[in-house]
Every structure is written in C-alpha cells, then in structure tokens.
C-alpha cells in the first residue's frame, strides 16, 4: 500500500475504446465509457495457487469494440459478455504494453452498443510473495489473505481497479473444509456447499465500494466476539493459541465504534442494518500496520493482540491507535471514498486524526495523554519530514501504482492529520463535527474530495474556508512565523521554513492563535506576508496549544517572556517551545547555541516534554556520531538532565501509570545509551534475575536486549522466532541497535533471510541507527541492493524501508557511496525515498558545518 512509463502511441487513456476513439491520451486511469455496477466473484483456494471466475455487470455509455480493465500476473481465459440475453465471446489480449500498464483487453468481433452488459471471464494466479494481492502467510498454520490497497486487487481478479469505480460485490470462496472462511460480509450458512474435504461459502452482497476494500481470509482461525449497543457484531480472529489476546483490541473496537457512530451522525450499517459486522484478523505476515477492508479489517498481529502482564505500554498504545484508525476509515475512506489517489491524504490524514479523537473519548481503556502523543508522533514528525528540502504537497497528483504507493508517507498521514487538527481548532469542534456530518451524508456510498469537505465545513462555519485550506494541501512545506515585539504591538511575518536554507515565495493563509497571559486567546488570520497585532500582555505564546502546523521565531523579548513562564505552560505548549527553538536552530535560523544552553530549563519530568528535549540532543549526537568531543559533551549534558530520574527508577516496579512507565522506560533507555553507570547496572541486574530466577523483563525487555545482545544473540534469535507476545519480535529487532561485536553484526546481516520479509528493513534500520556499525550497515546495503530488493520480493514499501536506513551517515567517503547507489536505483516506487535520504544527508552535512556553534552551546560557561 504503501510501476509505468506509457509507450507512446500504443495505448489511449486506458479504457473501453469506442469505434471512433483515438489513442491521444497517455494517462493511466481507466476511462468511464464502461463502468462496473456489480461483481459476482468466485475464488478457489488451492495449495499451489488460486483460480476463479468473475461476472461483472457493466454499463456501457457509448458503442465500444473492446473493454479494458485491470489485471496483473493473472492467466485469463474464456472471456465474453452477455448482452440482451446473448453471449458474445471476446479475445483476451495481454501483450507487453498491457502488462506494463497492468490491464487486459477484451476485444470483441464487432462493436457493442451502449447499454447494460454482463462481462465474464475465468482466471488463475499464483500467490504473491510480496505481501500484496492474494498471498499466503507462513507459520505453523498457513493463512491465505488479501491486501489490495492501493492497486493490488488486480492481482487477485480482473477488475476496474480504481477508487471512483465503486460497485457491489457478491463473493463466494471455495476452500478446504478445515478452514474458517471470511469475507467483507457475513456468510450465508444456508447456501454453504460441501463436497469431499472442501466447501464453498457464499457471502451477503456488499454495499457499493471500491475494489481496494474487497477482502477475504482463509485459515484455521478461532474467534472471540462482542456486540455494540447498536447491534453490530465485532469479532477478533486469530490462532486458537492467541485469540484471547484480542480482548483489549475488541473492547477498544466496540467503544470506538459506538463513539464514531455518534460523532459522524451515521451508524455503522455495513452491509445493512441487522447484519452489520466487523471482523478483525491478525495476519502472520503483514506489510503495514493494518488495512481497513470494509467489514474485515486485517492487522499485523502486534497491532491487534495485547497480552496482559507481558505486552508493554507501547503495544497497548499501538493496538488502541491502530484499531481506532481503521474504524475511522469505515466512514472516511469506505462510506465516502476519495475520488482519486491524489486525495489519499484525506483518507489517511483524517483517519490518523480521528483515531486520536476516538481514543480521547472511549474511557478508561485509554489512560494516557492522547494529544501529547499526537503532537510527538504526528506534528513533530510531519514538520521534520516536510522541512527537509524536496518534500511534496499533501495533495499530490499521482497516476501510476508506484507513485501511489510512495505517498503512503508521513506527509499524507502526519502532516495531513495535523492540518485537519489545525482546521478543527480554528473553526471549533462542534462546527467541524457538523461539517463532517454534512460531508458524509452528501457523499455516502460515493466519492468525495477535499473541496467538497471544505465546502461542507464552510457552510456550517458560515464562511468559506477553502481558500485558507488550499494553500496547506496544494503546496509543499510550511511557514515559519516571525514575531517582532514592538512594545505596544507585534508584527507577524511569514516565510517558508527549510532545514536546507532553500526558501521560496510560498504564502499561506495561517490561522494563528495567540495566547495572552491573563487575557485568553485571540484568533488572527495571517493572509499576506505580514500583519500587525495589538499587544495585550507582555507574555504571550503564538500557536497556542501547538494547534497550528507552523514554526514560530520569536525575537529575544518574546522568547525571554516565554522562558520566564516555562514551568506554567501546558505539556504541548512546552513541547512546542522546544520544537520551535531547536527546529529553527537546526534550520540555521539562529538560536541553536541558546537552545543548547537552556535545554535543561525546558526539560521536565513529563514524558512528552522530556522526550522532545532529549531527542534534540540525540539527533545532534547522531549527526556528529564520529566526533568524539561532541558526543562526549552531549552525553554529559544528557546524563546531568536525567540522572535524578534514573536514580528513582525501580526496574522491578517500573511504574503504576502509562505516563510513569513511559517516562521511566525512556529515561532508562537513554541512560544506558549515554553510559550512566547506575542505569547500566540496573538493567544488568534485571537480566541476571531473569536468567537465574525467571524474573519477567516486562516493560524493559527491549532495553535489556539492547544492553546484553552481544553476549546473548542466540537467545534473542530464539525469542524472535518463538516469542511470548506478538510484539516481542519488534523488541528483539530494536535490541539489535546495541550490537557492538563484529561477529554478531556479520551473523545478523549474513543471515537476513531468517527474518520475516516485512522485518528485514526493520533489522537493517535498527543496526544503522545504533552507531557502532552505522557505516558498515550502510556499506552492506549499497553493496547488496539488488539482492535485498529480491529478498523483499520487489515490494516497494519494504524496499523503501531499507533505502531509508541510509540517511544516518555524514562522512565524505560513505556519503559518496550512498549517492552512487541511489543514482543507480531503477526500480519504480522509490523516488520520494531516495530524495528523503539525499535531503537528510545534505542537512546532516550542513549541520556539521556549524560545529563551533554546537560546541559553544554544549560547553559549560567556564570552559568557553
């Protein structure tokens, strides 16, 4: 989810060609001369592959001599169309041009007249190796499952595979009798056919939906279930040995579904009231976190299953966030679908934002600072990635599948969600909610776009907001708002922020919210290059509650006032100050030396504040990883900041709340990283007790693994393969960042094929971040690039994870090797990742050019 140059003169705008239609357009989208209305899809699951048949009720709007639809890596035969009761055979054409464009042509002996028809064909295919299309997961018990977003339904059956060609589906699956068979809708027991050791399950007809949401799963599965107050059946499916671990996800799902039904003003009724259901299934091998197939959500196991007493708080947050994200899609994405993939951000950004809305409103099952998490993992991440040179706009014009897969990134998700939050905070929660309800009711079971959404919100707000919002989604980057304190007034001005010193003439309509000490908040629209605001108090904060997606550059008076009140700021406002000071310092806008001197004053024992501050120092440490003096000074500063907290930590009782556990874990992990003896000794004592007396490592598992990996690599590999919790594999891989022995490094990278295909990039990324073998890991990747591409079965998203591991280097020789490697990549779907790596490396080298400023900020006053 996360490939084609058009051969000039060979193919028109892909679609069903009328008799007089010319090959003039070279777009990849199917034409709408023929559109689907309904599919009868039958699939037979076999050991070595699959086969099936599809009948598609279509509407033809003008006379055509052929019908073109999508298919990839399928053998298609016996195609034809029934028109007015007579079947007309068609010739299947799949040449090199069609393969390149992932289509099949059904050519008829004479023109078909405009009107209805029933297109039929049979097909066979092999299971995909790349975790897309219809594929088979390994493990003790094999599971056959689908993953179609964005454009992989065509790997499983011939179809009109684009989001604006919605249709209804009747699905039937032929599989072994021992298997549970699931699809988007409920099975109809009275229609089940059994023969020999096999059965055919028939499923209720779906509502109109896009092909990427079609799904089916076949495997030996057990389930647990619950019902929402509106009568929706929710189930978690998994292996019988672990399905009980789905209780937490099931409870989150039920509560979130009930909240969303109320928030959106439309109940969940897929496919219809009385038979509505949501199945959530943990899949053994899965490329992303989850997939929002309507009525049948598929998950990576650790994103759905939580083991009380053994899983950690990160697992809990991951399960809650992922379940709420996918349920948000049931309305935003499924009920109303973007017309084309250029509005993908509307699906993913909205689902990301609304998942936090859901977590905030479902009671005690979520007991952490939801919006503090949102700021750290969405606003901060989105700003870092969007501030690095050649980013891309939120709404990005895409045509081929490779481009579509690339925009499942932090811009679509994190920046998209942050912009939505900014709009909601500006127009108000209730107005925004009413606008969302209006949008959904106007476009139910159809397609929408961003302009339709802004129109609906504007009608509730009483003012057109489209002009304000369009700048945020149609141009890359974001602004820095400079604040000049003129005594009785403030002058606010804007320019584009860049970490690479590449500004331009971009302008945004910025919904600025200023918090005045003792005077409340004021909303201001900064439309042009600058505006003047009457000053209401001497202390103020621009971008109240970190609600806007922009940085703020204060002059000395403004920043001094904020720093004098730093302890009274909310968590997100305090994080905002840290992020702005260092974000601007990292962009060479000035103030980095000041920020480094004051970082200890910005710091607090709040998890989100502490993490924000320390991460800035660790990011600098990563830039200067081969500079012993800088690394030593950063470690010294970090040790001084966190030592009191480390001293209070009891590794056998790590905390009583999610906040305290998160804080203590983070500080302890950093303490081990920067060599605090007490932190190392505490972790080693926990490991000793684990080995000698079976003490559970619990929340500290990955931190312990990182500390002891060199002496216990075999143990960790066993835990990777036979872990006690679904999340343990991730903890083992995180622990690889602690490898310091060359023989262990060579053992891991020399045997990457022993890891699941979706984990190979994670392992490489962990080692490349670790420091000891950063350059060596990068050397390995650039020397084995093609081998790694084949190892992940040419899955662009998984290969891009490997490419992104190259961004952590700065030295001249290794950077030259990385650039040669990047220049030689010819695989489609990696252009954005390549640019991100280049931009990150360019920024790192730019930062190394201000070493003296960094040194001045780190040195104690007496040593300057």
UniProtKB/Swiss-Prot annotation:
Keyword terms: Aminopeptidase, Hydrolase, Metal-binding, Metalloprotease, Protease, Zinc
Organism: Encephalitozoon cuniculi (strain GB-M1) (Microsporidian parasite)
Molecular-function annotations in GO: metalloaminopeptidase activity; peptide binding; zinc ion binding
Gene Ontology CC annotation, any one: membrane
Residues forming the catalytic site: 326 (proton acceptor)
Protein name listed in UniProt: Probable M1 family aminopeptidase 1
Annotated residues for binding of Zn(2+): 325, 329, 348
Cofactor requirement: Zn(2+)
Cofactor note: Binds 1 zinc ion per subunit.
Chain positions recorded as substrate binding sites: 149, 289-293
EC number(s) per entry: 3.4.11.-
